[in-house]
Amino acid sequence: MSGNNNNPQKPQGSAPLPFGNPGMASASVPGNQGFAQSHMAANFQAQFQFSQAQALAHAQAQSKVQAQLQAQLQAQGMTMNQAQGSPGIGGLGPSSPSLTTPGSLNMKRFQQKPPMRPPGAPASNNTISPMRTMELTPAARKKKQKLPEKSLQERVAAILPESALYTQLLEFESRVDAALTRKKVDIQEALKNPPCIQKTLRIYVFNSFANQNNTIPGNPNADPPTWTLKIIGRILEDGVDPDQPGFVQKANPLHPKFSSFFKRVTVSLDQRLYPENPLIIWENARSPAPQEGFEIKRKGNQEFAASIRLEMNYVPEKFKLSTALMDVLGIEVETRPRIIAAIWHYVKARKLQNPNDPSFFNCDAALQKVFGEEKLKFTMVSQKISHHLSPPPPIHLEHKIKLSGNNPAVSACYDVLVDVPFPIQRDLNNLLANAEKNKEIEACDEAICAAIRKIHEHRRRRAFFLGFSQSPVEFINALIESQSKDLKVVAGEASRNAERERRSDFFNQPWVEDAVIRYLNRRPAAGNDGPGSW
């Protein structure tokens, strides 16, 4: 391997063998080992000479391209129409290998490697070109740091003094967004436990009837007698009595619908008259949407009494207090937090808090009936009152189905205290819903981002032309060097050093012998190609 500098010249007609490229098709190795070694030495010498000639030709071609480019630039007056958007100069980012030179120069870039045959391809009888391109290998992409789309770079801020106002607007926008986010969170927390006010729900129970006096014996086509039971209600506005139940005005849309106040409604009919289906049950959990009222229609011409059972739907859940706890607090049905708060106010009003340990309070006679202890810790109140709380009893109503007289037949109306959320709750819900639909803001942001991208593009173009105007020669040299580096990266030759490969010391390294053996072992044992051919 030490006699590479004294290799004899190979005849011109012989074809060179590829060296160190596993992607090339190779000829078969003859059975004579001595012939194989001599053949390898001859081909290796030819390959080395070819690599040296190729490197020299490439260097000469590159210098020729550079000289021709400078001459044409001078002839065209240094115009850069085609290269105005090129990055890669003056810290403008990585350059593109497809950049055209100024003045629309129709000049092809010199390829660094000649074409080559893929493995297994048949050998060609034509004269092989001394220039061959290597297989393209994808280069690893560098992650480009993505700048915020709405922010301006410091380079742009230095060029445009007016950008300081835009930066101030961005800071103000961030403060507004932070404030809106905090308010949105506060509204969401408030909606979880909405404040309510007590109002009176007036429930109307009445029935109407039809075809009760038109029954003609022996006429099967006559309409049968029917009756209809209706249960409706509405929230009283400041105690004002609404109109007659048969002509109840439309409910206030700000208030919940009638069925939302009930968990379950059960109507029991006379089992003697309606043995098949005497029980009608409506459940809020199975109802797809709240209703303004309930209506039951049946056939019949006999009057009877219907039983109505209404189970209230309290949100949050309410409990009925025991007699002992009711005597202490003076309330009958209430939520657990309000019951605990009422006990706390009772203790504070009577100064029952233990002065030595404020976490305890002393029980008077009324509290001793409830808790059964003389002293109790505040944290134990919630646990102690559990057996004094029970589900509130349902509302039982009875209505007589009348089939004569006034139609509809009004029986009675009933007032029930219910919790109605503040009307502002609906406005808060609408506010949260509208806050998510910011299409106009998104459109403005998109327009701002497009303007920012255009500003950055113009800054790159300005830097490109400014660098060319200040030093045209150095600028063009840097441009050519950048494009050459990009071409090497695309061709997968970024790690090669052509200058080192020109010297014989490069092939005297320890790895060369192992590379030659690996190359020979990779060649097929037999083939159609003869020695010295592709």
From Swiss-Prot:
Residues 314-391 form the SWIB/MDM2 domain. GO terms for biological process: chromatin organization; DNA repair; regulation of flower development; regulation of gene expression; regulation of leaf development; response to UV-B; root development. InterPro entries: SWIB_domain, SWIB_MDM2_dom_sf, SWIB_MDM2_domain. Residues 94-105 have a biased composition (Low complexity). The keyword Transferase does not apply. It comes from the Eukaryota. Transmembrane segments: none annotated. Pfam families: SWIB. It is found in: Nucleus. One of its GO terms (cellular component) is nucleus. The keyword Transport does not apply. Residues 1-12 have a biased composition (Polar residues). Gene3D superfamilies: SWIB/MDM2 domain. Keywords: Chromatin regulator, Nucleus, Transcription, Transcription regulation. Its main location: nucleus. Residues 1-33, 78-132 are annotated as: Disordered. Involved in transcriptional activation and repression of select genes by chromatin remodeling (alteration of DNA-nucleosome topology). Belongs to the SMARCD family. Part of a SWI-SNF complex. This is SWI/SNF complex component SNF12 homolog. It comes from Arabidopsis thaliana.
